[in-house]
């Protein structure tokens, strides 16, 4: 009834709304206020602060955000520097790498990881009573290559030990390893800035390797929540080497660089077939913290004393996980010590994407493992002749290859040299060297100055242009898809200015897609050869481009903004016949017309 009266009497509605806003007074209507009326009234009386505030221009907002981000980074760096000044981080790493072998370490079962679960299993792998270990000598060769490449001293006599523990992935109740007398000792790995070490570590870090030991892998566990766990014993007794570094790492980035470098060394000498990305290499890190202004700690690790209590983080499966886990554990230990707590020696875990490590179990000591010599295995005796032959047959170490590629012979940047070495197990590097050799033969009629940049140009085409086509097509590297001679001929035509850069990329794509015509024939039949423009044609194109934007011309003349010449070059290339306008000549003509500078004699 009231609502109908209000609709028929707008003036009464206004009075009632005003009364609602003023609150109840004597003589006012006794009816309850309408549910929506106060809200309408309140909105009509309020003024929004955000509406009256000036809107910040987008460019200004972006600048403010960039400044805030820089300030945060400066604050973070200052905090990290203060932490480094006060606390000393010490890291040691244990790397477990699956060796490149066809048979297991103590049985003739296959090491294939693609077969049906539990199909490559010998009686000894499952610890059947009465079964005996049979050492497979073929597993020793990749292990020796790894040890030599890591600058270790090979021991003429080494022995196997049993490491006792009870877990479902180890059916024998012990793991065969080389705890007391490993086959290799006293090695090292050198790290440089291009390996990714922390800037505060300088230009060179040498990390000692305490020992490398042969051991057998465990079964692979697969969990199916909530309560099912399956075991694949194909992996049991797969040959491993455990590489134990000295605790000489003091930065998380350097810890990750160390693992990355060791993996690269192992792959370069064919000691392993896969790396961290496919599970062929796993890392455990030991982390300890101590205050720099206090007396050295009482703990010892790897023969180095004065350390804080260490914790071990198990089964890290990526380089980023190594760095992130060390950072998280460092921060956790610092927080515990600063709050008056005590670091417990324990084993901890790490989950990708997490910010904290988690406790798995109390750290087991050496006595708990009850190490003892394995009575079923004789000593491992390694002859000096075998070591000498393997040493002579090893490929050039990665560091020497980088030094060669970045030197005067090739002149590549470190950023280009590293992937050439690391990609495709050396196949990309071999292909690149073939391209350079052929290209230099094709350019013999040129002077030394013209030939000086051929290797750098070839590196760009192999890595970025051809590599980009492989990536885009999601294809593995195949040197026969674009033979080295074909790529060298394309680059040669480009160097002689018979084709443009765009045409060279077009021809490369055609060959990549299966065109097998010789390069000269392809260029002729597809009408891709560059037909140079005359000077008058360049002048006409330049004048047309200048006429499109006279304001920009004035900016170039008045403020010497030479970078804007590139816009006019682009316009000339768009207006001209495809493939005929050379950017360098277009730039020369533009400078002559706009700046009055001519390269003509």
Swiss-Prot record:
HAMAP family: GatB. One of its GO terms (molecular function) is glutaminyl-tRNA synthase (glutamine-hydrolyzing) activity. One of its GO terms (biological process) is glutaminyl-tRNAGln biosynthesis via transamidation. It is found in: Mitochondrion. Coiled coil: none annotated. Its EC number is 6.3.5.-. This is Glutamyl-tRNA(Gln) amidotransferase subunit B, mitochondrial. It comes from Aspergillus fumigatus (strain ATCC MYA-4609 / CBS 101355 / FGSC A1100 / Af293). PROSITE patterns: GATB. The keyword Transmembrane helix does not apply. Keywords: ATP-binding, Ligase, Mitochondrion, Nucleotide-binding, Protein biosynthesis, Transit peptide. It holds the Pfam family GatB_N. Allows the formation of correctly charged Gln-tRNA(Gln) through the transamidation of misacylated Glu-tRNA(Gln) in the mitochondria. The reaction takes place in the presence of glutamine and ATP through an activated gamma-phospho-Glu-tRNA(Gln). Subunit of the heterotrimeric GatCAB amidotransferase (AdT) complex, composed of A, B and C subunits. Its main location: mitochondrion. Belongs to the GatB/GatE family. GatB subfamily.
């Amino acid at each position: 009834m009231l609502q109908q009266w209000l609709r028929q009497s707008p003036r009464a509605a206004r009075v009632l709304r005003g009364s609602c806003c003023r609150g109840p007074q004597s003589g006012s209507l006794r009816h309850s206020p309408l549910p929506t009326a106060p809200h309408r009234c309140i909105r009509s009386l309020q003024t929004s602060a955000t509406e009256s505030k000036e809107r910040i221009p987008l460019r200004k907002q972006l600048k403010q955000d960039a400044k805030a981000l820089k300030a945060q980074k400066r604050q973070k760096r200052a905090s990290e520097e203060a932490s480094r000044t006060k606390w000393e981080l010490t890291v040691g790493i244990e790397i477990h790498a699956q060796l490149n072998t066809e048979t297991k370490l103590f049985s003739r079962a296959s090491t294939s990881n693609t077969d049906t679960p539990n199909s490559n299993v010998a009686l000894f792998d499952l610890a059947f009573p009465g079964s005996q270990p049979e050492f497979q000598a073929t597993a020793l060769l990749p292990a020796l290559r790894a040890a030599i490449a890591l600058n270790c001293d090979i021991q003429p006599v080494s022995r196997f030990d049993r490491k006792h523990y009870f877990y479902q992935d180890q059916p024998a109740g012990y793991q065969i390893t080389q705890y007391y007398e490993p086959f290799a000792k006293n090695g090292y790995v050198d790290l440089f800035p291009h390996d990714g070490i922390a800037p505060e570590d300088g230009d060179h870090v040498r990390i000692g390797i305490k020992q490398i030991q042969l051991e057998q892998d465990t079964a692979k566990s697969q969990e199916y929540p909530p309560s099912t766990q399956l075991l694949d014993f194909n992996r049991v007794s797969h040959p491993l080497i455990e590489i134990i570094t000295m605790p000489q790492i003091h930065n998380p980035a350097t810890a990750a660089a160390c693992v990355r470098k060791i993996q690269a060394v192992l792959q370069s000498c064919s000691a392993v077939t896969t790396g961290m990305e496919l599970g062929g290499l796993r890392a455990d890190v030991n982390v300890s913290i101590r205050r720099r202004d206090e007396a050295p700690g009482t703990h010892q690790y790897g023969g180095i004393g004065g350390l804080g209590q260490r914790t071990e983080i198990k089964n890290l499966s990526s380089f980023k996980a190594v760095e992130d886990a060390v950072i998280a554990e460092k921060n956790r230990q610092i927080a515990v010590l600063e709050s008056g707590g005590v670091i417990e020696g324990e084993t901890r875990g790490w989950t990708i994407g997490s910010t904290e490590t988690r406790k798995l179990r109390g750290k087991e000591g050496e006595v708990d493992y009850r190490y003892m010599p394995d009575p079923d295995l004789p000593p491992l005796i390694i002859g000096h002749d075998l070591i000498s032959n393997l040493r002579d047959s090893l490929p050039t170490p990665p560091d020497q290859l980088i030094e060669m590629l970045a030197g005067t012979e090739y002149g590549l940047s470190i950023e280009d040299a590293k992937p050439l070495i690391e990609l495709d197990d050396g196949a990309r590097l071999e292909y690149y060297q073939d391209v350079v050799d052929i290209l230099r033969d094709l350019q013999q009629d040129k002077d030394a100055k013209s030939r000086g940049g051929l290797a750098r140009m070839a590196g760009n085409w192999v890595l970025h242009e051809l590599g980009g086509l492989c990536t885009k097509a999601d294809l593995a590297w195949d040197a026969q898809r674009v033979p080295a001679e074909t790529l060298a001929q394309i680059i040669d035509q480009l160097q002689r200015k018979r084709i443009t850069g765009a045409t060279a990329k077009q021809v490369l794509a055609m060959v990549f897609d299966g065109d097998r015509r010789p390069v000269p024939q392809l260029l002729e039949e597809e009408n891709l050869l560059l037909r140079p423009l005359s000077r008058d044609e360049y002048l006409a194109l330049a004048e047309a481009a200048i006429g499109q934007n006279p304001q920009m011309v004035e900016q170039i003349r008045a403020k010497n903004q030479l970078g804007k010449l590139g816009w006019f070059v682009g316009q000339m290339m768009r207006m001209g016949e495809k493939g005929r306008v050379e950017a360098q000549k277009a730039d020369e003509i533009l400078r002559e017309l706009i700046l009055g500078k001519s390269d003509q004699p």
